[in-house]
């Protein structure tokens, strides 16, 4: 009997990237998508994922604040942080917060898949 697909919540405001995730990971994961931090928190409660992929820059909040809320609501959930920020400040901002991966955009989707699978 096949194992059930892992549930992955992608919190990403870029429509093109959400479409890329949906197409690339179809059949590999059960996916849910949120374009804002508030949508992400609602889905986190309504459909708890096995893994969260979190963009650091969202229209209604920043990723650090959202990561703190996620940790408070769902301690232990594996979080993979993604960002287009190339400076060191975003990396320093999440130090001390639990996450299992940090990817700079653009990144290879196979790399993201490997991190999701390992989480």
Annotated model-derived regions:
Residues 14-32:
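Two-component/phosphorelay signaling modules centered on CheY-like receiver
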Residues 33, 58-61:
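Residue-level signal for the "D+5" position in two-component response regulator receiver
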Residues 36-39, 62-65:
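Acidic catalytic/metal-coordinating carboxylates
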Residues 45-47, 69-76, 97:
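Conserved phosphotransfer cores of two-component systems
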Residues 47-53, 58:
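Active-site beta3 strand of CheY-like receiver
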Residues 65, 86-102:
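Alpha4 helix (beta4-alpha4-beta5 surface) of REC/receiver domains from two-component response regulators
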Residues 89, 107-117:
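C-terminal output helix
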């Amino acid at each position: 009997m096949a194992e059930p697909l892992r549930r992955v919540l992608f919190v990403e405001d870029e429509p093109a990237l959400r479409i890329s995730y949906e197409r690339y990971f179809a059949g590999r994961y059960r996916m849910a998508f949120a374009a804002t931090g508030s949508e992400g928190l609602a889905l986190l409660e309504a459909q708890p994922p096995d893994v969260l992929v979190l963009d650091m820059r969202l229209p209604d909040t920043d990723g650090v604040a959202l990561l703190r809320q996620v940790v408070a609501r769902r301690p232990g959930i594996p979080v993979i942080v993604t960002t287009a920020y190339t400076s060191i400040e975003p990396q320093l901002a999440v130090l001390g917060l639990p996450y299992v991966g940090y990817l700079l955009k653009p990144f290879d989707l196979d790399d993201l898949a490997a991190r999701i699978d390992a989480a």
